[in-house]
Amino acid sequence: MSSSSPAGTARTIRKKVYDASLKAMFTLRPERIHGIIADGLGVLQMATPVNRAMGRVIGVNDPVLSQEVFGVTFPRPLGLAAGFDKNATAADTWTALGFGYAELGTVTASPQAGNPTPRLFRLPADRAILNRMGFNNAGAADVADNLRRRKSRDVIGINIGKTKVVPAEQAVDDYRRSASLLGDLADYLVVNVSSPNTPGLRDLQAVESLRPILAAVQESTSVPVLVKIAPDLSDEDVDAVADLAVELGLAGIVATNTTISREGLVTPAHEVAEMGAGGISGPPVAERALEVLRRLHARVGDQLVLIGVGGISTPEQAWERIAAGATLLQGYTGFIYGGPDWIRDIHLGLAEQVKAHGLSNISEAVGSGLPWKDSAV
């Protein structure tokens, strides 16, 4: 896109405005900014004409990007990752910002406040975020009420997790309760057993613990069920979860959540140590998230839908995930640092690659191993 074209000029203006806004926002505590943005998007959700106008300006509506996945039509492959819209207060706004869909939550069966603040930190040198939010949310019943008030039919998934005070031996019933309350209000459900911020949660990724949870969720809803895994799993455990997902007939796997690793960071180690425990999202998780995705695709082929998430910053990286086996993509940290044009740039880049390779739809590129063609941009 030429910077002198009307579209290029508009993009330049949007970028300058967003960069200036980001600089101002970064003077505030991260969770305060999150609250301001979430409240603003909640208000915007009620302004349907504004939403539609935004969607026309920012959204990339190219038919080569539209796919039918587990019986649901996704107009664009990049969606909002779970963690931003925890209570579904802006569910009708995300596609207006350019996303193809949104994964809401994480939602727990009972409301909970999450971990003590501060619990959200920026690592600007890494364009990353560290969080230990702890599934703060209004609870499944309240979120269900919010979803019933939706006006649009934009595609949404709901990410469900374990209530912190519920002991591990009661986790099955806890997940079942959330699935029963929320399943019929979503296009798909994701079972989150991979957040590092709820004590003992990641232990539920072990197959013997995970099997009854997934089976209970499947029994509680008719919508597709996926499981979200951590990048910190061993390769053997990744294989075991993949095999279980195929055995149970799950719709897919979301790969991956945040990492507890602190390796390879640009941010000084003492600064990261002062932030404390938590999972890191953004570029530091990208390499391992891609490794896990490739391993999953090699293991399951097209038996499961794979959703690639973790450190996707550029159109090239997005294409790499598609070529490695991801049917859909998600992002959160890239959106924080890049704004709506990050979403638009990724979708434009993906559409250009589809055409450059002589394909008719992005689904043909999934798992293809096709390289990025520089001549396409």
Curated annotation (Swiss-Prot):
Cofactor: FMN
Cofactor binding: number and manner: Binds 1 FMN per subunit.
UniProt EC number: 1.3.5.2
GO biological process terms, semicolon-separated: 'de novo' pyrimidine nucleobase biosynthetic process; 'de novo' UMP biosynthetic process
Binding residues for substrate: K86, N131, R132, M133, G134, F135, N192, N197, N257, T258
Residues at the active site: S195 (nucleophile)
InterPro entries reported for this sequence: Aldolase_TIM (IPR013785), DHO_dehydrogenase (IPR050074), Dihydroorotate_DH_2 (IPR005719), Dihydroorotate_DH_cat (IPR005720), Dihydroorotate_DH_CS (IPR001295)
Localization, UniProt: Cell membrane
Keywords, comma-separated and alphabetical: Cell membrane, Flavoprotein, FMN, Membrane, Oxidoreductase, Pyrimidine biosynthesis
Keyword Flavoprotein set for record: yes
Known pathway: Pyrimidine metabolism; UMP biosynthesis via de novo pathway; orotate from (S)-dihydroorotate (quinone route): step 1/1
Membrane-protein topology: Peripheral membrane protein
Single GO cellular component term: plasma membrane
PANTHER family with a match to the protein in the record: DIHYDROOROTATE DEHYDROGENASE (QUINONE), MITOCHONDRIAL, DIHYDROOROTATE DEHYDROGENASE (QUINONE), MITOCHONDRIAL-RELATED
Family: Belongs to the dihydroorotate dehydrogenase family. Type 2 subfamily.
UniProt-listed HAMAP family: DHO_dh_type2
Function: Catalyzes the conversion of dihydroorotate to orotate with quinone as electron acceptor.
Assembly and oligomerization: Monomer.
Protein name per the record: Dihydroorotate dehydrogenase (quinone)
Classification of source organism: Bacteria, Bacillati, Actinomycetota, Actinomycetes, Mycobacteriales
